Amino acid sequence: MDHSCTRFIHRRGPPTRTRAGFKRGKRPRIQQRPRARVSGTIPASRLHPAPASQPGPCPAPGHCPVGPAHERPMGSSQEEGLRCQPSQPDHDADGHCGPDLEGAERASATPGPPGLLNSHRPADSDDTNAAGPSAALLEGLLLGGGKPSPHSTRPGPFFYIGGSNGATIISSYCKSKGWQRIHDSRRDDYTLKWCEVKSRDSYGSFREGEQLLYQLPNNKLLTTKIGLLSTLRGRARAMSKASKVPGGVQARLEKDAAAPALEDLPWTSPGYLRPQRVLRMEEFFPETYRLDLKHEREAFFTLFDETQIWICKPTASNQGKGIFLLRNQEEVAALQAKTRSMEDDPIHHKTPFRGPQARVVQRYIQNPLLVDGRKFDVRSYLLIACTTPYMIFFGHGYARLTLSLYDPHSSDLGGHLTNQFMQKKSPLYMLLKEHTVWSMEHLNRYISDTFWKARGLAKDWVFTTLKKRMQQIMAHCFLAAKPKLDCKLGYFDLIGCDFLIDDNFKVWLLEMNSNPALHTNCEVLKEVIPGVVIETLDLVLETFRKSLRGQKMLPLLSQRRFVLLHNGEADPRPHLGGSCSLRRWPPLPTRQAKSSGPPMPHAPDQPGARRPAPPPLVPQRPRPPGPDLDSAHDGEPQAPGTEQSGTGNRHPAQEPSPGTAKEEREEPENARP
């Protein structure tokens, strides 16, 4: 038998149905047909599809698709009932014909129709009147294997919002940029993804340098009770070891510990977290014990006495759920018996992940500063706008008050917890809800009128002493977690920080919360929250764009109310497989370094010009160019394949990846006592 003959296997029955749907992780069958080679310009039949009643001719013999996909081409305006028109190309300063990337700055730009391949890469974040892609760009994408988004016929860029927390503000902001919202959480062709609850799928499919993703993967180092406690303890141990080095920097800084007043201590200029005094954990964080560790649990049960009140909180809860006070031995004994019974339960040992949530007990501050007899705390914001390099900001928030008068011995949690969820349980909430939230200006006026002369406070104490103290505490917490935080270009986070002031005007950090509440159910919140969200997104987009291009971060044109705490351009540079290395971000020299080898291309002297980086210390992998989110004040758009004028012969897209992010699922904002 001749085995060289080709054998054909025929299937019986009707032919296999061609599915037009999209299966995740695989290309649709309708897109696997051979592409027609395009030479010169794109045929008019591709740019001007024939009406549905008069099907047009096939673009090339032998490649005429059949079925619904041919009758309604993917990505064409025919599906949306729009008239197909050729794109209007725009010419930049270099004569390059391409899409308009300066829509927000060019008022004269003429908008074009949705393009066939406009979703190949997200458009400019500030582009509200962007023109459609030119024919030359479409041809280049076709020859290069570009294809439209298999999910939608609209051009994009796309954004996804998971949950309702701040969704209206975020959606309005993105739509004002010309972005379009998607509602499928499984899609990975987004430019911005903002979710209340973290999902490992989001981090697994995240494309560094191409997308923006809200919440750092391991922000639990700061935003859970146990995470924050462990982070601060680790920082304290490191500082203790450093202080024992004779003549060390920390040893000299520890000499300032006996300073009588914190406001008299020196503090460096904003933007560089190099405090001249090391904070001690016990100075701003209440004494706390972990109940999931036996030795800490037993230590707490031993030291407890009825002269102090303690508060027990789950490590990652929200809305005050699971919080209760410990005032007497009976309540502590009940808690001790419950923890022991759970520890002895064999089911808990077999499936510890199904056990109850870990808890902490924290010394309750019994002497809070009162406002008209009511307890209050201050919500401020820590913004991580960029992680490569780190750009950290402080933002003012508002004051939250209880409706009930403060009584330390009361069993009503509404008089102890200031969050809106607890206050809504009061029957008087709808009548007095405007009294549960104060602006920082209102709080400053009250403290100045009530305590300024009587207590000898500084003028405008809220905006001077309190502001500086909160910035110092935030800086300390960030520096403690910084070596362990996952950093990739495109990660950003907005963290809510809750501070309590006691009657001695000492400031305490209660907790830090992921996914802070962005609701606007009060007039003060309607004034504060939108500004916080809008400036957050503005700073995220600007720092992302500058980091991608390798430009200097400062000045930041979108910075308004947020205060810069840390500019990480001098920090260790991220590398493959980790969050930091010994490399630093390349300096910004005023003249080119001498070299014995062949001369290197000279970068023009303009803002953002940088010297080519030295050879990498670790193997690097190329990264595809991300979305061009620039605006007109940052320079003209570059042609595909060209270099940025401010980066020498090194393209900013060739940055190393900082490694794989840890994946987890967290609950939204924690409760705030």
Curated annotation (Swiss-Prot):
* Entry annotated with the keyword Nucleotide-binding: yes
Give the transmembrane region(s): none
Gene Ontology terms: biological process: protein modification process
Keyword Amino-acid biosynthesis attached? no
Question: Which region ranges are annotated with the description Disordered?
Answer: 1-132, 569-673
- Keywords from the named record: ATP-binding, Nucleotide-binding
Molecular function via GO: ATP binding; protein-glycine ligase activity
CC per GO annotation: cytosol
Task: Output compositional bias ranges, type Basic and acidic residues.
Answer: 89-105, 661-673
- Residues bound to ATP are 362-365, 375, 377
Q: Where is the composition biased (Basic residues)?
A: 8-36
Quote the biased-composition stretches of kind Pro residues, using this chain's numbering: 52-62, 612-627
Q: Which residue numbers delimit the TTL domain?
A: 155-552
Task: Summarize the protein's role.
Answer: Inactive polyglycylase.
> Which PANTHER family does the record match to this protein?
INACTIVE POLYGLYCYLASE TTLL10
What is this protein identified as? Inactive polyglycylase TTLL10
